[in-house]
Amino acid sequence: YEFDFNNYKAKDFPLFCRHSEFTDDTVMTLAVAKALLDTCGQDDAAIKAALVHQMQQLGRAYPDKGYGTRFIGWLHEDDPHPYNSYGNGSAMRVSAAAELAEDMEQALHLAKLTAEVTHNHPEGIKGAQATAAAMFLARTGSSKADIRTYVEREFGYDLSRSCDEIRPDYHHVESCQETVPQAITAFLESADFEDALRTAVSLGGDSDTLAAITGSIAEAFYGVPENLKAECRRRLTPELEALLLAWEARAA
């Protein structure tokens, strides 16, 4: 449902088909999750080192999953450094930070660390933190109204436009500032987890990343139906499924 031009802008599409497969969003989300699990209680330097290691290791193992050009270069550097990106890659992979955090301060701090290893532009960090904040609020019982208010107040995102207002002129963009507010809006308008995914895709943008951001918040708010979990798991490699199961066991 994602093309360079003329993206699909409706909600009535098959959620899965025989060609469905995971993308870079899945790979990097699992890499971040493993890094954070492996470094619980350690200092920032250790966490960042683990993030770089896991992201490079998994990224190199799954090379053709839709990474950005600059990120591909970073994956293969011997001494990688952040490259001042404000792309939406920082927000698509951040969910583990919100899931592990014991309070909002920790959620924001972990989100910042996960972004900074590549996306150290202020907008790249903000996108990751806004996503983590919305997810943390969702999983700790906040209402949609409270989530909207917090995100608008703390991050300055304009969440006033509806999806119907966003959709006509929206297109494939990869910046945090043009992806994260739209993804959060899709969650705010959703009726359940599946509807959240469909709404995000229907905007017609960077579909997998929109759905990754919207879906992470929706999972925390609604939970995920078991049939959808099963459909996703069977499309993972044994290695990635093992990482997912380990994450679910240790984060529970």
Predicted region positions:
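Structured, active/binding-site neighborhoods that engage oxygen-rich ligands
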Residues: Y1-A252
